[in-house]
Amino acid sequence: MKPVTARKRSGTGATVNQMELRPENSEHLQLIRAYEAGSVQIGESFYASSFLLAPARSPVEWQVEQFSQINESDFAEILTLSWDVLLVGTGDQHYLPDLRLQRMLARAGRGIDFMSSRSACATYNLLALDGRAVAAAIILPLRASAVTGR
């Protein structure tokens, strides 16, 4: 596909600046296409339980059902993978890890952000489309109100 060029003209008809728009190519990315109370859609597949999603890797089940259960061993696998930013979807609500877990994750020396699972799904796509090496650990299922915002 050929790039599109947009030109902004001043009142005199002269070109003031130019911006080249290129079609987005996201074929190689595993993007979160939809999320609802009972599942998340990644590509053509649906996931109804918590999962880990990392660059160049198929999603795998994550054995965490709620944030209050989370501990250091739950991050062992994902910390061995290659990524720059990890988004941890904490379920229906935004939670922060306890001090012990914060210290362990800080030693990993990479960006780790905690947010609601709904926010993590949306943020994952934005970062992936921006070319960032992003991973996500998403706790499911969500209540219907967490998805709709009501």
Residue ranges of model-derived segments:
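Conserved phosphate-binding catalytic cores of ATP/NTP-utilizing and phosphoryl-transfer enzymes
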Residues: T123-L129
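Short acidic loop-to-helix transition motifs that present clustered carboxylates
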Residues: S117-A122
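Mid-chain, well-packed structural core segment of small domains
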Residues: I78-M115
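Non-catalytic interface/targeting segments
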Residues: K2-S73, L81, L129-R150
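Short active-site-adjacent helix-start/loop capping segments
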Residues: V60-W62, H94-P97, T123
